[in-house]
From Swiss-Prot:
Record Pfam families: EphA2_TM, Ephrin_lbd, Ephrin_rec_like, fn3, PK_Tyr_Ser-Thr, SAM_2
Record note on what altering residue 875 to K does: In a glioblastoma multiforme sample; somatic mutation
Residue ranges annotated as motif PDZ-binding: 1019-1021
Highest taxon listed in the record's lineage: Eukaryota
Domain annotation SAM: ranges: 948-1012
Subcellular location: Membrane
Protein name stated in the entry: Ephrin type-B receptor 6
Domain statement: The protein kinase domain is predicted to be catalytically inactive. Its extracellular domain is capable of promoting cell adhesion and migration in response to low concentrations of ephrin-B2, but its cytoplasmic domain is essential for cell repulsion and inhibition of migration induced by high concentrations of ephrin-B2.
Chain residue ranges for the region called Disordered: 163-182
Gene that produces this protein: EPHB6
Functional description taken from the UniProt entry: Kinase-defective receptor for members of the ephrin-B family. Binds to ephrin-B1 and ephrin-B2. Modulates cell adhesion and migration by exerting both positive and negative effects upon stimulation with ephrin-B2. Inhibits JNK activation, T-cell receptor-induced IL-2 secretion and CD25 expression upon stimulation with ephrin-B2.
Length: 1021
């Protein structure tokens, strides 16, 4: 029993403690009541004013708790003459509002039921009315009291929830009889039975107020009146303290903002605008009932401090811990190779010998410089050498390893470690490094321009992001080198002699400078479908060689170098030849046999006979027709060998063409991700390609799903076969195809920024003229490369050019033939429109339109003109005007590409040279040339705005595509067209228009606006 009693006692104690905590918790958030007037428990005379005298009686009664209290009573129902109404007023003393904006009143009262009073005639009430009146000063004693209703503002009519029967069986005309205070026998209920009502009124604006109660025929007793205002209590939350705040005077739905103060070592949270630290102070809102709500913002602990006691305080990080940014996260241990010797550390300093780069975040570990590179060696290549080395043993804990090469020229043989001892000096300017001398990412460099038989010391330094912070010089390794010019020069060209399905015979002339007796030649070859590092070599003592064991229908690259007693010379340029498809007979090119070593008379006779035979065959073929009558189209260039472009449409089976011209990819290596656009054959998706043993790369994937027509499949694969034949830094690269399973897929490199036209429209005015020239130069270089294969693009436009994250422009949509002459009419040359004849010259015309698109930031060529209007303008030899801000030199180049006579248009190599000159000498962009040397061409005017339909500068800005400045115009009061027409270039920065492209565009349209207003005679400009 004792144990049970103890347990019960413990439970009661625990319950009391829990209740106490709940009470404390609730009291911390409950509203505060500031009392303005309270008659509860009053036992002495209150002395409020009544009208008429005797209408209300102040008496002492027992309340519902049997406590004696002063009350005001009115009960004149039974004694009133029949047909007369009651109008009894009771007014409080003057009540100071003490800063309250709204007052609340809580009434304790009792009402007798009319049915218990025996009163008839409708003069009995069970309600009374509550009023209030504001005043700056209390009423003077001698002032005439006026109870006129106009002086009072009604609060509400108060009705009892319960009315009670009379305490005696008979009614009385006196209130004292109705509310008699007398002895009560045992068991009899004493005191009054009460109703409690609460009302509020406001807003209060004067010094104080009176409250009045109007009785119109009730039998009631006012037991207690409590006037008070609500106040939100002082509170601490979100690391901010908020002061005690008066509730709003407009009622429960209105809010009063309170500004908080951050606790020690805390700061306001960011506003979310621009990510700036140190936002606005936090705010909490007090409603009309004295309750906090709607928190805006807050505070957070400063760097080096973490939350404590929930969200009430910020304490310093202990030693060994740190916090780098403001926020409410806890402190963290110091990163590797760093420490925090003092409390409140925002960052951990690095240990001696270790550093943190300026770009490293505070949470990054401290790192050190790398050790020296290892195992330097070199290969002599004529007057140049290829220097190799291995990675340092220690990388310092970083991944941004770079290499610098230091070159020293010495007078005699030097040891690398000696540093020259004063006999070595920096290499001459003629020595050059490929790709560069400093900041190398690969462990090799080609050093050229070295003098023969001169000793050099090449030193390779290993550096990373913290090397500059170290007081010690970078760790380096050095090697002695020497070169000789006695090796032969490069073999200038390689020719194909014959080919079969599994072999190719090639020949070549001697180097221009043999520099001694040629001992032999080394031929290097590789399959174009494979990586160049997987090449093979063979040695020939003559200037001809046959390569066997090749794959049918594959394209191979060839290079040759000669060897003398001094060593190998450099390789010559690469040329590409293709083996015959399986089953075709060996192809001989006798006209090339003149290059085969041998001069006997029988060979000469054979050459003569073969030449006559070839001429006859060529003559017959020309008579039968021209065009793409062979699978293999060739273009000869002196000194460059033979270039081939294979038309896949000549294959009966498109899959055979794609297998010969592109690399097949296993679908298991492909991961398809989200949709990034729409192509000619459906959705284009981003994906990942990771062949076995190779690095993963992002690709664009276009798939042709099952059910497509055979002609659609041929077109789909044919375009990939065309793209796979070209390798150029400004042409979209084909990564592979999937033809052995479904769906068919074509994989190309991923171009992050999409088509050039939409890219420019999204970044209008953000590039300099030279940057735009560089973009055009890249496209022109790609077209020069394509034209060297006699390949015609047919649909060149800014939309057919893609842009990657490095702003490199790459030509795409190869093999996408326009569907009819009206397609892409805005980019088509006159001969294409008239006869459907596509040539490289027509591509030059289209390139000129592309130039105009670039300089206008993706503007639609010929604006909103209809296709018939465009056709008429071209036939009448009208040409596009320069876009706003376009340098004259660039527009003249556009006009050259739009020559009606296609023979007078420049070639792409001339365009590339012109762009190179502009980049080297930017002043040539502004050169207009001699007008007399150029044909006079009429220029189109942009489609004029319909000014009568534009009712404001805001609408005008929208019409010209600059609606982003509408708020700027409104802010500076530019409300009429006359105001806008007065603007000049100097005014635009003040309006917030700082982009050069936007300034030029706006000034151009202001000139058009001025012309319109001159015609209307409404403004002087």
């Amino acid at each position: 029993m004792a144990t049970e009693g103890a347990a019960q006692l413990g439970n009661r104690v625990a319950g009391m403690v829990c209740s106490l905590w709940v009470l404390l918790l609730v009291s911390s958030v409950l509203a505060l009541e500031e009392v303005l007037l309270d008659t509860t428990g009053e036992t002495s005379e209150i002395g409020w004013l009544t009208y008429p005298p005797g209408g209300w009686d102040e008496v002492s009664v027992l309340d519902d708790q049997r406590r004696l209290t002063r009350t005001f009573e009115a009960c004149h129902v039974a004694g009133a003459p029949p047909g007369t109404g009651q109008d009894n007023w009771l007014q409080t003393h003057f009540v100071e509002r003490r800063g309250a904006q709204r007052a609340h009143i809580r009434l304790h009262f009792s009402v007798r039921a009319c049915s218990s009073l025996g009163v008839s005639g409708g003069t009995c009430r069970e309600t009374f009315t509550l009023y209030y009146r504001q005043a700056e000063e209390p009423d003077s004693p001698d002032s005439v009291s006026s109870w006129h209703l106009k002086r009072w503002t009604k609060v509400d009519t108060i009705a009892a929830d319960e009315s009670f029967p009379s305490s005696s069986s008979s009614s009385s005309s006196s209130s004292s009889a109705a509310w008699a205070v007398g002895p009560h026998g045992a068991g009899q209920r004493a005191g009054l039975q009460l109703n409690v009502k609460e009302r509020s009124f406001g807003p209060l604006t004067q010094r104080g107020f009176y409250v009045a109660f109007q009785d119109t025929g009730a039998c009631l007793a006012l037991v207690a009146v409590r006037l008070f205002s609500y106040t939100c209590p002082a509170v601490l939350r979100s690391f901010a303290s908020f002061p005690e705040t008066q509730a709003s005077g407009a009622g429960g739905a209105s809010l009063v903002a309170a500004v908080g103060t951050c606790v020690a070592h805390a700061e306001p949270e960011e506003d979310g605008v621009g990510g700036q630290a140190g936002g606005s102070p936090p705010r909490l809102h007090c409603n009309g009932e004295g309750k906090w709500m709607v928190a805006v913002g807050g505070c957070r602990c400063q760097p080096g401090y973490q939350p404590a006691r929930g969200d009430k305080a910020c304490q310093a990080c202990p030693r060994g811990l740190y916090k780098s940014s403001a926020g409410n996260a806890p402190c963290s241990p110091c990163p590797a190779r760093s420490h925090a010797p003092n409390p409140a550390a925002p960052v951990c300093p690095c240990l001696e010998g270790f550093y943190r780069a300026s770009s490293d975040p505070p949470e990054a570990p401290c790192t050190g410089p790398p050790s020296a590179p290892q195992e330097l060696w070199f290969e002599v290549q004529g007057s140049a050498l290829m220097l190799h080395w291995r990675l340092p043993r220690e990388l310092g804990g970083r991944g941004d390893l770079l290499f610098n090469v230091v070159c020293k020229e010495c007078e005699g043989r030097q040891e690398p470690a000696s540093g020259g001892g004063g006999t070595c000096h920096r290499c001459r300017d003629e020595v050059h490094f490929d790709p560069r001398q400093r900041g190398l990412t690969e462990s090799r460099v080609l050093v050229g321009g070295l003098r023969a038989h001169v000793p050099y010391i090449l030193e390779v330094q290993a550096v990373n992001g913290v090397s500059e912070l170290s007081p010690d010089p970078p760790q380096a390794a050095a090697i002695n080198v020497s070169t000789s010019h006695e090796v032969p020069s490069a073999v200038p060209v390689v020719h194909q002699v014959s080919r079969a399905s599994n072999s190719i015979t090639v020949s070549w002339p001697q180097p221009d400078q043999t520099n001694g007796n040629i001992l032999d030649y080394q031929l290097r070859y590789y399959d174009q479908a494979e990586d160049e590092s997987h090449s093979f070599t063979l040695t020939s003592e003559t200037n001809t060689a046959t390569v066997t064991q090749l794959s049918p229908g594959h394209i191979y690259g060839f290079q040759v170098r000669a060897r003398t007693a001094a060593g190998h010379g450099p390789y010559g340029g690469k040329v590409y030849f293709q083996t015959l498809p399986q089953g075709e007979l060996s192809s001989q090119l006798p006209e090339r046999l003149s290059l085969v070593i041998g001069s006997i008379l029988g060979a000469l006779a054979f050459l003569l006979l073969a030449a006559i035979t070839v001429l006859a065959v060529v003559f017959q073929r020309k008579r039968r027709g021209t065009g793409y009558t062979e699978q293999l189209q060739q273009y000869s260039s002196p000194g460059l060998g033979v270039k081939y472009y294979i038309d896949p449409s000549t294959y009966e089976d498109p899959c055979q063409a794609i297998r010969e011209l592109a690399r097949e990819v296993d679908p298991a290596y492909i991961k398809i991700e989200e949709v990034i656009g729409t192509g000619s054959f459906g959705e284009v998706r981003q994906g990942r390609l990771q062949p076995r043993g190779r690095r993963e790369q992002t690709v664009a994937i276009q798939a042709l799903w099952a059910g497509g027509a055979e002609s659609l499949q041929m077109t789909f694969l044919g375009r990939a076969a065309v793209l796979g034949q070209f390798q150029h830094p400004n042409i979209l690269r084909l990564e592979g195809v999937v033809t052995k399973s479904r769906p068919l897929m074509v994989l190309t490199e991923f171009m992050e920024l999409g088509p050039l036209d939409s890219f420019l429209r999204q970044r209008e005015g953000q590039f300099s003229s030279l940057q735009l020239v560089a973009m055009q130069r890249g496209v022109a270089a790609a077209m020069q490369y394509l034209s060297s294969f006699a390949f015609v693009h047919r649909s060149l436009s800014a939309h057919s050019v893609l842009v990657n994250s490095h702003l490199v422009c790459k030509v795409a949509r190869l093999g996408h033939s326009p569907q009819g002459p009206s397609c892409l009419l805005r980019w088509a040359a006159p001969e294409v429109i008239a006869h459907g004849k596509h040539t490289t010259s027509s591509d030059v015309w289209s390139f000129g339109i592309l130039m105009w698109e670039v300089m206008s930031y993706g503007e639609r060529p010929y604006w909103d003109m209809s296709e018939q209007e465009v056709l008429n303008a071209i036939e009448q030899e009208f040409r596009l005007p320069p876009p706003p801000g376009c340098p004259p030199g660039l527009h003249l180049l556009m006009l050259d590409t739009w020559q009606k006579d296609r023979a007078r248009r420049p070639h792409f190599d001339q365009l590339v040279a012109a762009f190179d000159k502009m980049i080297r000498k930017p002043d040539t962009l502004q050169a207009g040339g001699d007008p007399g040397e150029r044909p006079s061409q009429a220029l189109l005017t942009p489609v004029a705005l319909d000014f009568p339909c534009l009712d404001s500068p805001q609408a005008w800005l929208s019409a010209i595509g600059l609606e982003c400045y509408q708020d700027n115009f409104s802010k500076f009061g530019l409300c009429t067209f006359s105001d806008v027409a007065q603007l000049s270039l100097e005014d635009l920065p003040a309006l917030g228009i700082t982009l050069a492209g936007h300034q030029k565009k706006l000034l151009h349209h202001i000139q058009l606006l001025q012309q319109h207003l001159r015609q209307q005679g409404s403004v002087e400009v």
